[in-house]
Amino acid sequence: DYVANYVKANLPQYAALPVLSVSAPFKSGFGGGTDYTDVAQGNVAINNAADLYLYPNTVYAVKVSGADIKNWLETAAKRFNQINPALTTPQNLISSFPGYNFDMFTSKDISYEIDVTQPDISKGGSRIKNLNYKGTAISPTQEFIIATNNYRASGGGSFPGIDGSKTI
């Protein structure tokens, strides 16, 4: 709501655009089996909250197209290895791609599927299927405002099209 309210109050030229948010887990097992945040039952302490968000990032907003969102998600989907459904032996689903680059759009207004049977974007594949906003397919030219952090907005993680030039 912070970014949506800021846009409405300070950037009226973008007020009609949908505002979505994206985030990534910082501790998601990338560093091994202990690379998770364990919050014990009961009161949450300051160190629990600090353990969830490790970096001094700030909130930024970027104006992107539907094509940018798809490429953003395709890059995040590199978190998963390609799975061969014909194999009956176990296959590792999680790749060595850092969890802090596994950006997820979590708004109820956006939905998508990640097809891990397809190669990832770095191999010319397309894993993101059924990318919708409010139940309707997102057009490559449709515009959105995305709340993210300054690291990602400035090009951190090498996400296609997110290079600092789209910050509003």
Identify the meaning behind each predicted range.
Residues 2-168:
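Feature captures C-terminal
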